[in-house]
Curated annotation (Swiss-Prot):
InterPro entries: ICAM_VCAM (IPR047012), ICAM_VCAM_N (IPR003987), Ig-like_dom (IPR007110), Ig-like_dom_sf (IPR036179), Ig-like_fold (IPR013783), Ig_C2-set (IPR008424), Ig_I-set (IPR013098), Ig_sub (IPR003599). Either the first or the fourth Ig-like C2-type domain is required for VLA4-dependent cell adhesion. PROSITE patterns: IG_LIKE. Pfam families: C2-set, I-set, ig, Ig_3. Residues 25-698 are extracellular. Residues 1-24 form the signal peptide. It comes from Canis lupus familiaris (Dog). Cell adhesion glycoprotein predominantly expressed on the surface of endothelial cells that plays an important role in immune surveillance and inflammation. Acts as a major regulator of leukocyte adhesion to the endothelium through interaction with different types of integrins. During inflammatory responses, binds ligands on the surface of activated endothelial cells to initiate the activation of calcium channels and the plasma membrane-associated small GTPase RAC1 leading to leukocyte transendothelial migration. This is Vascular cell adhesion protein 1.
Amino acid sequence: MPRKMVVIFGASNILWMVFAVSQASKMEIFLEPRVAAQIGDVISLTCSTTGCETPSFSWRTQIDSPLNGKVKNEGNNSTLTMDPVSFNNEHAYLCTATCGSKKLEKGIQVEIYSFPKDPEIQLSGPLEVGKPVTVTCLVRDVYPFDRLEMNLLNGNDLLQSKDFLEPMEKKSLETKSLEVTFTPTNEDIGKGLVCRAQLHMDEIDFEPKERETTKELQVYISPRNTFISVTPSMRLQEGGSVTMTCASEGLPPPQIFWSKKLDNGNLQLLSGNATLTLIAMRLEDSGTYVCEGVNEVGKDGKEVELIVQEKPFTVEISPGPQIIAQIGDSVVLTCGVTDCESPSFSWRTQIDSPLSGTVKVEGAKSTLTLSPVNLENEHSYLCTVTCGHKKLEKGIKVDLYSFPRDPEVEMSGLLVDGNPVTVSCEVPNVYPSDRLEIELFKGETIIESKSFLEDMDKKSLETKSLEMTFIPTTEDTGKVLVCLAKLHIDEMEFEPKQRQSTQTLYVNVAPRDTTVVVSPSSIVEEGSPVNMTCSSDGLPAPNILWSRRLSNGRLQSLSEDPILTLTSAKMEDSGIYVCEGINQAGISRKEVELIIQVAPKDIQLIAFPSESVKEGDTVIISCTCGNVPKTWIILKKKAETGDTVLKSRDGAYTIHKVQLEDAGVYECESKNEAGLQLRSLTLDVKGRENNKDYFSPELLVLYCASSLIIPAIGMIIYFARRANMKGSYSLVEAQKSKV
């Protein structure tokens, strides 16, 4: 589109015309000497005045040619517009401003040029490596062309430069060009052709004074080095398939076309892909196949010859030449035929024994099912396929084994520390048993192993076992007993070939070291609390059972707590107590005797025949204590000079022919570990008159009677004590004696 340019006289290319109408003022005008205008654009020249209210303006060219523009006056401004700029506007223009009698005139030179478009790059043909090509650079509608300079570059390399300095015969817009011929190479790929044009008009100011165009080089390479790969082979079986892959070098990458050469030499297009796959090939698919790589600058071809051969039928038997099966499983043998439309099948064993299976035919496949498979099926089986006049036979061997369960580990009894136990490891229903090995481990140590290498009389499922006896200890607790069974059949592939069972050992310990602790003591006073604590070692920890032994020897159960407590012991609680530690491995027993003591009581101290006797009489002093066992009896005679311990027998002291000095206080002390009790009496001895020996008949009778009665009384007292009291009495010998 044409541009519009406004030029104002004065500063910055503006034409100012200043008129001073005042009698004392002067008019001055400031303007640039030149202005540039491009042909086809619009330019406006504006003339302005100051200092005059009503100036008048006029425009003309310096040579009085037509203005070729429109003038518009507004106040102090006058504008000359050239729309569009043409060669007729290339003049020096004058603006005259009149204010009263004053006139002022200024001029401006309008320079005309044309440089509207970037250069154009043209190629004589596609850029092909190794082939020359002509590059033309065009600059259209340029003026003045004698100021034009053109450069053509390939990347940063200058190919050609040209100036147009010939004189112009007339003013006109010209199209100028620069031509260069060069041969592209691989190194030119990705480079750019640059056409640069410069309009050298330094005397005037305009933009742009330089234009350039860049064209990226699209360098082509004609297809070459075309090659073909064939998979699996160029010789094929009828019904097979083939994949042919073609590749060709070039730039841009060539497109691949596959064709087949007909008998008349023409090509039959098959595919536009690089890979051609032919399936279910027939004999007529034999022939020559052509691959062509094609791009914009050429093509390159390669041929391959395919030969399709007649294919014979084949027989396959699955799952393979050998099948490993476990007795009791289901086995399916499959015989398949290919490349035969109507085959017939037959099955047999290699030794012509019964098949013992079910045969089924479906099209090109026949199956023999053995379910469940047993020892009678351990044979080599043959499948015969007849197709027309041809027969093919394939065989498969059925090998059997039986190893269905993990070993079974059993103990002859409970594991008790120190007691022998027999371990049995049994492997059920194994075949062939002569390949079996059983190993017995305790922890990681093998303790027994056994192989069964004896010949088998017949094919059968066998149950084999390994036994051993060992003495467990507490160190065995936590260890693992492992029974490992291995079926050594290396020539057969199956899993598992070894099985194992484990049993963690827990060794019991029969109760032992049973102890009883009585607190505070096994002998206590009546009313005191008693704790009897029982403990016993063993695995598992023994249970505690408290019992009391009765008078008939039997045990009376009391408690299953380790601690037996009597909060207030009574005398009848005395006796034998039994603690038993019991677990599944045995029993341990401990007895303790508990004695409940009672402080002495009911003491009786008597003098016989009386506490008052005559000198010469016989006196028995007797001390008894009721129903208390293990009591000490001490008889004393009190005196100021000190007590005298009397020699008593069963608590009785006899004084024959009592004397006056025998009179006094007699004391009985009854004590045991629970306490003591005292009793005393005063014996009064009266003297005889005249202090003469007197022996009357009456005294003789009394003496004789007392000699019989006193021992009798003593015996009565003794047996009464023994019958009615729990305990015994002591005679005091010097100090005291315990009975």
